[in-house]
């Protein structure tokens, strides 16, 4: 039987950085609330969580990179909401934010989690920020906890 390697869901003693886009803050504030709730319920201490607010999703990768390079965090959580409009702006912002976060994640040596909603409508965003479809902020924070504990097994 092969050995299974999995991460636990304990945030005790772990340090988390959260980068949140202010644009569409009626959604991103709910995502942040879900992420903080997940971290606290999983044992994270208030003093081990820092939140950086950026103007929009496009700016998240730069601050994520700086936070990752600081060595202060075990994982980063990137949160925001990009809602499709009538121009191609949505496509550019989504593509560059996701590429930037992936780039930081691969170079950082720590989990950098993607929690940016990319939806066609405001209603879809609201559903994913704490109503019908759960709270993706919570989901991404739980993923960060699991990934921190999994990654530690490879040191």
Swiss-Prot record:
InterPro entries listed in its UniProt record: LS, LS/RS, LS/RS_sf
Residues that coordinate or bind 5-amino-6-(D-ribitylamino)uracil: 23, 57-59, 81-83, 114
Organism: Desulfatibacillum aliphaticivorans
Active site: 89 (proton donor)
Protein's recorded name: 6,7-dimethyl-8-ribityllumazine synthase
Matching SUPFAM superfamilies: Lumazine synthase (SSF52121)
Annotated EC: 2.5.1.78
GO cellular component, one term: riboflavin synthase complex
Biological process, per Gene Ontology: riboflavin biosynthetic process
Swiss-Prot/TrEMBL keywords: Riboflavin biosynthesis, Transferase
């Amino acid at each position: 039987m092969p050995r299974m390697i999995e991460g636990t869901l304990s945030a005790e003693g772990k340090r988390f950085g959260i980068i949140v886009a202010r644009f569409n803050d009626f959604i991103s504030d709910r995502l942040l609330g879900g992420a903080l709730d997940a971290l606290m319920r999983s044992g994270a201490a208030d003093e081990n969580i820092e939140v950086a607010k950026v103007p929009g999703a496009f700016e998240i990768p730069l601050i994520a990179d700086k936070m990752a390079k600081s060595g202060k965090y075990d994982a980063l959580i990137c949160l925001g909401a990009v809602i499709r409009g009538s121009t191609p702006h949505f496509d550019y912002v989504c593509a560059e934010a996701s590429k930037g976060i992936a780039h930081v994640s691969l170079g950082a040596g720590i989990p950098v989690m993607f929690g940016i909603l990319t939806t066609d409508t405001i209603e879809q965003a609201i559903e994913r920020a704490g109503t019908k479809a759960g709270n993706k902020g919570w989901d991404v924070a739980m993923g960060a906890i699991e990934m921190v504990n999994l990654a530690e097994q490879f040191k």
